C-alpha cells in the first residue's frame, strides 16, 4: 500500500496541467514583493510541485516572518523549496524491492549529477530527522544515496546520469557527449556525461554522512549497495594516485581518459585524454575535471582533495557503525589522514603579499594554479565542506587573496562583485539549455555563450562568502548584492554579468537556490539581527 501511495502521489503531480518550469521561471509572476526590486513569485502551484513537505513549508513560513525586507523575504520563499518544488523528477522504488530511489534533476537539465543532487539535499539537512515514511525528507535522502550507489557501481568515473529504468522516464540525449572518447566505455542509456570529477565521489560520501549524522540510521547502510559503492570509490582513489610516468620513464596506463571534439580547452584534456603530467609521490588524488565541469589545468585539484578527505573521514563513522567493516573503515581513516598530509605538503604555497596560502591546483612538479572558482568545492568553501575552521591562518590568507584582484576570476562591476570562473566561454550557442555544452538560458529567453570579457560571476560564491564569515558588514553587503541581482525574477542564477543585471545564465538552478535558503537558515541561527535589516534604497 505504501508503494501504491507513493506512485499515486507522483502520478497526480505528473498529470496536472502544469507549465514547463523552464518557461514559467523565465517570466515574472504576481503577487510581487512590493519592495525596491519588486521580485516575482516563482513557486509552482501546490498541485504542480514535485514533492510536498510539511516541515519545509512550516520552515518557510516561520523564517519568512523574521525577514523584514520584502525582497529578501520573497527571494527566500522562492529559493529554499526550489528543489522540492521543481526538481524531484521521480521518487519511487527499485523493481521488486523496498529499496527507495530518488531521481533529482539539476533544474533545467533532465539528468542527475552526483554533486548537484547531494548538495540539493544538503539544503534540507537542518530539517532532516529519522523517519521511515515515504513522503519524508529522510526517504528522499535514502533514495538519493541508493541511486548514487547504483550509479557509482555502474560507471564509477562518470559525473551525471540518466533516470533509473524503474522511473519510466526516457533517457535524455546529450549531443556534445557524442563527440567524447572516454575510457572506460559507457552507454548513454545510463550515463548523461562521463567527466571524472573527484568531488562527485566526495559528494556521495557527503550525502551519506549528512543522512547518518542527522538520523543515526546505521541499519540503512547495511542494505543494498552502499558498502560496495564505497569500495568502488576507494578503487577510483587508488587508480587516480598513479603518476603520469613510471619509474622507468614509460607513460602509465591510467584507468580513465577523456577527450572531446570541441573549440574550448576547458571541455577536453591534454595529452590524448590523460591531462597534463602529474608527478609521483604527492599523495594527492587526481581529478580530471572541476565542479564546474571544466577540465583541470593541474590534476592535483586541492578543493576536491579537501572535500574527499573531510567526508571520507566522517563516512568512516558509518562504516564502523555498520559492524563487520572495521578494516574498510580503517582504510578510509588512513586515506583521509594521508590526504591531509599531502595537501599540507603540496597544496600550501608561500606568497610575498599573503603569506602561506592554498593553491587551487598543483601537479607535483612545483607548478601551481593560484585562483579560485565559484563552484563548490572551492578554496573559499573549505570551512563549509568541513575541512578546516574559518579562523585557520592559511585559510584566512587564502581568503584574502581569492577575494581580491589577485584572483584572476574575482569579477567586479556595478551589479555584483564575486568570484566567477572560466565555465562560460565564447561563441554563439544552439537552442538547447545544456550544462554539458555550456549552453545557457540568458535573460528574457535569449540563449548565448558568454565571453570572459563580459565578466560573469557566480552568486554561489557570494553565498559561500556569507557562510564563511562573522563580519556583519561583509554579510550585509553580500546579501544586498544577491537581492539586487536577480533581474526581478526572484531566483538565484548560475552566473550574472557584473555590468548588466539583465544578462545572466540559468534561472532554474536548484542547487544555488537551495544553498541560498540554507544560508538564510544559518543566519537565523548565527546572525538573526541581520534578517531584520532593510535592503531597500541601498546600492551594492
Regions found by a protein language model. Give the residues of each.
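CBM-like carbohydrate-recognition segments
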Residues: 158, 167, 423-431, 436-441, ...
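Low-complexity, Ser/Thr/Pro/Gly-enriched N-terminal "stalk/linker" regions
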Residues: 16-115, 155, 176-177
Amino acid at each position: 500500500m505504501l508503494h501504491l501511495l507513493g506512485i499515486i502521489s507522483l502520478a497526480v503531480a505528473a498529470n496536472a496541467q502544469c507549465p514547463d518550469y523552464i518557461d514559467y521561471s523565465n517570466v515574472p509572476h504576481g503577487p510581487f514583493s512590493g519592495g525596491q526590486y519588486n521580485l516575482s513569485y516563482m513557486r509552482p502551484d501546490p498541485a504542480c510541485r514535485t514533492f510536498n513537505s510539511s516541515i519545509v513549508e512550516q520552515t518557510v513560513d516561520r523564517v519568512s516572518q523574521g525577514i523584514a525586507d520584502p525582497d529578501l523575504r520573497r527571494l527566500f520563499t522562492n529559493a529554499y523549496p526550489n528543489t522540492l518544488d521543481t526538481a524531484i523528477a521521480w521518487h519511487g522504488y527499485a523493481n521488486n524491492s523496498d529499496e527507495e530511489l530518488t531521481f533529482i534533476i539539476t533544474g533545467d537539465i533532465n539528468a542527475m549529477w552526483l554533486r548537484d543532487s547531494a548538495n540539493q539535499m544538503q539544503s534540507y539537512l537542518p530539517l532532516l530527522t529519522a523517519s521511515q515514511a515515504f513522503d519524508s525528507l529522510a526517504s528522499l535522502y535514502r533514495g538519493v544515496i541508493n541511486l548514487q550507489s547504483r550509479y557509482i557501481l555502474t560507471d564509477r568515473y562518470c559525473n551525471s546520469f540518466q533516470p533509473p529504468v524503474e522511473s519510466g522516464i526516457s533517457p535524455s540525449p546529450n549531443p556534445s557527449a557524442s563527440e567524447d572518447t572516454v575510457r572506460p566505455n559507457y552507454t548513454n542509456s545510463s550515463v548523461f556525461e562521463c567527466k571524472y570529477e573527484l568531488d562527485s565521489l566526495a559528494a556521495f560520501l557527503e550525502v551519506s554522512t549528512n543522512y547518518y549524522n542527522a538520523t543515526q540510521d546505521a541499519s540503512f547502510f547495511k542494505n543494498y549497495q552502499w558498502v560496495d559503492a564505497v569500495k568502488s570509490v576507494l578503487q577510483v582513489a587508488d587508480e587516480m594516485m598513479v603518476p603520469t610516468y613510471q619509474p622507468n620513464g614509460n607513460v602509465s596506463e591510467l584507468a580513465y581518459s577523456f577527450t572531446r571534439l570541441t573549440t574550448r580547452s576547458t571541455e577536453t584534456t591534454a595529452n590524448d585524454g590523460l591531462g597534463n603530467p602529474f608527478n609521483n609521490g604527492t599523495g594527492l588524488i587526481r581529478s580530471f575535471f572541476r565542479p564546474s565541469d571544466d577540465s583541470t589545468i593541474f590534476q592535483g585539484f586541492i578543493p576536491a582533495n579537501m572535500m574527499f578527505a573531510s567526508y571520507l573521514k566522517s563516512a568512516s563513522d558509518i562504516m564502523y557503525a555498520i559492524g563487520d567493516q572495521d578494516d574498510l573503515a580503517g582504510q578510509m581513516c588512513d586515506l583521509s589522514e594521508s590526504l591531509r598530509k599531502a595537501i599540507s605538503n603540496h597544496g600550501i604555497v608561500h606568497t610575498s603579499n599573503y603569506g602561506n596560502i592554498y593553491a587551487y591546483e598543483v601537479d607535483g612538479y612545483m607548478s601551481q594554479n593560484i585562483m579560485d572558482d565559484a563552484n563548490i568545492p572551492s578554496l573559499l568553501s573549505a570551512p563549509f565542506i568541513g575541512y578546516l575552521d574559518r579562523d585557520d591562518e592559511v585559510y584566512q590568507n587564502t581568503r584574502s587573496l581569492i577575494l581580491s584582484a589577485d584572483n584572476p576570476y574575482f569579477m567586479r562591476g556595478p551589479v555584483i562583485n564575486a568570484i566567477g570562473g572560466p565555465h562560460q566561454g565564447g561563441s554563439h550557442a544552439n537552442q538547447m539549455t545544456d550544462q554539458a555544452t555550456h549552453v545557457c538560458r540568458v535573460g528574457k529567453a535569449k540563449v548565448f555563450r558568454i565571453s570572459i570579457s563580459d565578466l560573469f560571476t557566480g552568486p554561489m560564491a557570494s553565498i559561500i562568502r556569507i557562510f564563511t564569515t562573522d563580519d556583519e558588514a561583509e554579510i550585509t553587503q553580500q546579501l544586498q548584492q544577491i537581492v539586487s541581482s536577480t533581474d526581478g525574477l526572484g531566483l538565484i542564477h548560475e552566473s550574472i554579468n557584473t555590468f548588466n543585471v539583465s544578462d545572466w545564465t540559468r534561472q532554474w538552478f536548484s542547487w544555488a537556490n537551495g544553498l541560498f535558503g540554507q544560508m538564510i537558515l544559518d543566519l537565523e541561527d548565527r546572525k538573526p539581527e541581520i534578517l531584520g535589516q532593510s535592503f531597500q534604497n541601498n546600492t551594492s
